[in-house]
A protein has these predicted regions:
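N-terminal beta1-alpha1 cap of cysteine-dependent amidohydrolase-like domains
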Residues: 2-236, 243-318
Length: 318
């Protein structure tokens, strides 16, 4: 009899926990943003691209985000503060892409600072808003945080490398849920694509109190000096990669610096998935379906640029 009571009691506990966990799961599912939209910041065109428009976004960044289940809004330059306010309230995160404009004086940098400041303020009031920086975007994050250009020359242009993981990477937001297989691939195989002449050295990071207190170093690499290749903020959903995960599946320039192995494609997928899942935590939304539709990058057609640039396709804007 006592045993029967124990069994019934055990089943009661199991049913209780199952019901509680089921309701918790459904709560999470109900509150997850299933239609995330991420902004990509445009930047000034170089002389090669100027005939197509005054600013551009490489299409590989768009595909990177779309591949993990989000849509894209181009964040164009030279817009009013009111327009940037409206865009910020409408999108669920922003990506600062790679490129070659000036960190201090470009319109790209000016607009990035607007969104960076808004993101800090929003996250401080528990309004989740992630930022992702790739290559120049990664460098720009260090500039916006420190107020200084602390980059050093590394000439790391056209290289693939494995990443040197730090102890801090093990409990990082970015890599914590990565399958062990992918983690080991990044650490042992040359699947990270580097196209940068400048980098933030670990020495300059260590000497700068603002950077030390704001960013956790997740990976480093060495070329001439040791530099930071992946980082994330301690308190904010802000992430930077000096390398180019979007190039692996979407850029086909004949270059030794772009890996196309199945392993490298897996790496890209898991990083894109991480970023989009961060955006799913944001509840920002457009004021109407029409406003949303009018803002999406679907309103623009990519141009094939693979015969004369490092990008296969790019979007251009006036």
């Amino acid at each position: 009899m006592a045993r029967g009571l124990q069994v019934r009691g055990l089943w009661g506990l199991l049913i209780f926990f199952f019901c509680c966990s089921s309701s918790a799961v459904s709560f999470v599912l109900r509150n997850e943003n299933e239609r995330p939209i991420i902004g990509i910041l445009a930047q000034e065109t170089s002389k090669t691209f100027r005939k197509f428009g005054s600013s551009y976004i490489a299409a590989s960044y768009v595909k990177f985000i779309e591949s993990a289940g989000a849509r894209v809004v181009p964040v164009r330059l030279n817009r009013s503060n009111e327009e940037y306010d409206e865009i910020f309230r409408s999108i669920n995160g922003i990506l600062f892409p790679g490129g070659s404009v000036n960190l201090a004086t470009s319109e790209f940098s000016r607009v990035a600072k607007i969104f960076y400041t808004k993101a800090l303020e929003a996250n401080d009031r528990e309004d989740y808003f992630p930022i992702w920086g790739t290559c120049l975007g990664h460098q720009l994050l260090t500039y916006l945080t420190s107020g200084e250009n602390l980059l050093v020359r590394t000439n790391t242009n056209g290289f693939t490398m494995p990443l040197n993981f730090t102890e801090a990477s093990k409990d990082s937001k970015m890599f914590h849920d990565f399958p062990e297989e992918i983690y080991e691939l990044l650490a042992s195989e040359p699947v990270s694509s580097h196209f940068h002449f400048w980098s933030l050295s670990t020495q300059n990071y260590s000497r700068n109190e603002k950077l030390r207190n704001f960013y956790k170093i997740l990976t480093t690499n060495f070329h001439m000096v040791e530099f930071i290749s992946t980082m994330e903020a301690y308190r904010y959903p802000i992430y930077g990669v000096q390398w180019h995960p979007e190039k692996n599946p979407f850029e086909w320039k004949n270059s030794t610096g772009i890996p196309h192995s199945s392993a490298s494609i897996k790496v890209t997928f898991f990083l894109a998935d991480f970023l989009v899942n961060e955006a799913r935590k944001s509840n920002h939304h457009f004021s109407s379906k029409k406003a949303e539709a009018d803002a999406l990058i679907y309103n623009f057609n990519p141009v094939y640029t693979g015969t004369f640039s490092s990008f296969d396709q790019a979007y251009f804007f006036d």
